[in-house]
Curated annotation (Swiss-Prot):
Other remarks on this protein: Present with 2181 molecules/cell in log phase SD medium.
Function in brief: Component of the Mediator complex, a coactivator involved in the regulated transcription of nearly all RNA polymerase II-dependent genes. Mediator functions as a bridge to convey information from gene-specific regulatory proteins to the basal RNA polymerase II transcription machinery. The Mediator complex, having a compact conformation in its free form, is recruited to promoters by direct interactions with regulatory proteins and serves for the assembly of a functional preinitiation complex with RNA polymerase II and the general transcription factors.
Subcellular location(s) of the protein: Nucleus
GO biological process annotation, one example: positive regulation of transcription by RNA polymerase II
Protein name (Swiss-Prot/TrEMBL): Mediator of RNA polymerase II transcription subunit 22
Lineage of producing organism: Eukaryota, Fungi, Dikarya, Ascomycota, Saccharomycotina
GO molecular function: transcription coregulator activity
Residue positions where N-acetylserine is found in the record: 2
Naturally occurring in which organism (per UniProt): Saccharomyces cerevisiae (strain ATCC 204508 / S288c)
Amino acid sequence: MSNQALYEKLEQTRTILSVKLAELINMTTIADRNDDDEGSFAQENSELAVATTSVMMVNNQTMQLIKNVQDLLILTRSIKEKWLLNQIPVTEHSKVTRFDEKQIEELLDNCIETFVAEKTT
């Protein structure tokens, strides 16, 4: 990913987190009840249903917040890794061979001769 794409994704995730957190705060505010009624059974069931739905919505928003925070952590890690890797100087590999090819060829020939000699006897 390019730097620009990482920063755009970071900004997008930050915006989503802000919106989801605001929605979560709005859902958790408790409205004033109208206590003028005597509290009939139907009203209690209705309040229970609303409360249950609200709890489910809060849980859903919380899970989305957690996922977005995880995305944010992954993005910041990618940005840090990219920054660190760009700081490391690139070393050129030497073209000098580590092994003597002639010596390796002789060892291979000796092994083949030994193997063939064992098969024939």
